[in-house]
Amino acid sequence: MKRAMGFLLSSVMLLGVLSGCGGQNSSSASPAASGSQAEGQSGEQVTLTYWQHSSAARDEMMTKLVAQFEAENPDIKVNCEFVPEADYTQKLIPSLATDTAPDVFQVQSGMVSKLAEAGSIQPLDETVMSTEMIEEEFVAAATDGLKYEDKYYGMPTDMQTILCFWNKDLAAEAGLDAEKGPQTWDEFFDWARAMTKRDASGALTQAGWGTSGYWPEVVSYIEQMGGSFYDESTNQFVFADDEKSVAAMEQWISLYRDDKVYDTQFSKTWAGFRQGLIGMMLGHPAMLGNLPTTAPDLNFGVSLIPANGDSRASCVSSWGYVMSAKAPSEAATRFIEFLSSEDVEKQWTLQTGELPARKALLDDADIKADPKASVALASLDDAFVGHLQTAALETAWSESYEKLMYTDEDVKTVLQECQANLNQELSNGL
């Protein structure tokens, strides 16, 4: 289901090194991690614990925001813990069955329904953030995945869509329009072939497109080709039974299998793009802020995802701020409300390059000042929510896609196995 959305990016980095949230060391659990202080009589301070998957920019930004929140809300103290992303889910899920669960935390949006069904999280406090207000002020595609049985259980963060990036110098060398970029999928695939180079022995020396099956890219292509990836009426993956989806996947993987525009042994995808070894990438708008910092000499262009006819459908992936079942509802929702406020969303967007979800920010002059940011905003005019948004689903997809890359197994057969594994995972509990 497509929804208009909002987004942007910036390469502005947060200045200075800030102390840990709420006076706690950000690399270790706070003393309050074993349970929050309950909301008590007037004048009592409530202590919340907050967890998020760690990255330097996000951690520093959250530290700053928590200090701002505590100054504005002296009756609430927030202790933070920043967990390495590789360990985050393994640490979080077991904690939800114990007193060690955080009060407020980030979770992939695909986990919300499972956590809500299990009773591990609670709906947002309607007295603080009403359903009417959320649906009036936020873009639907940003919040749809955070709703369960007509109640909102969280607010969005870390939202991304898919854009097209290309190396202008490599494109020009290949005789391509380096300023315009590929506008259709036929052009995109032709560009990938044109920018692929091999030496006399046949060894790859330049890859045309760093394609490795990242699911939002693939699902965007399937959607544009008229395929059905997921049936919302049955809550089941259906791509292996859909002729258009299978045909789209056969075309997609043929660029790797047959045209050999990339080889995973040649270079990692984004590392190779930064080094000038890969001609094109599909990826998140956050790379618009990342690339000038990590590859300052890279001459790159960016455009909307290639089109099929009038469709530039782009898949949205996101996380959400939610609160555990044990959290003090009013205080925890106030913290989530703060993190979702217009001012904070704008700060977060400019500092981290992630998508704003508030409608009011879609035409923000500061965000749109960067021409590349305007492209990112436009990409969300034809956006839809993806359904592979849990770690387990992503792993099952990646394992199947590796078979497509590294073996000559029949595409439909691999997709049928993948679909069965994904649907089985949907039926699994936490």
Which positions does each model-derived feature cover?
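Hinge/lid segment of periplasmic solute-binding proteins
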Residues: G40, Q108-L163, F189, I222, ...
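Extracytoplasmic/periplasmic substrate-recognition and gating elements
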Residues: A67, A71-E72, K77, A172-A174, ...
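Extracytoplasmic "Venus flytrap"/periplasmic binding protein-like
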Residues: Q68-F138, K147, E173-G175, Q183, ...
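Periplasmic solute-binding protein
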Residues: V112-S120, A141-K180, G210-T234, C315-M323, ...
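Short, solvent-exposed loop/beta-turn-alpha elements that line the ligand-binding surface or hinge
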Residues: Q122-F138, K180-Q183, D199-G208, G227-A247, ...
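Long, aromatic- and glycine/proline-rich binding clefts that accommodate carbohydrate-like moieties
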Residues: G145, S303, T349-K403, N428
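Conserved C-terminal helix/tail region of periplasmic/extracytoplasmic solute-binding proteins
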Residues: A172, A178, S254, S379-L430
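Glycine-centered hinge/linker elements that transmit conformational signals in sensory
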Residues: F189-T196, T234-D263
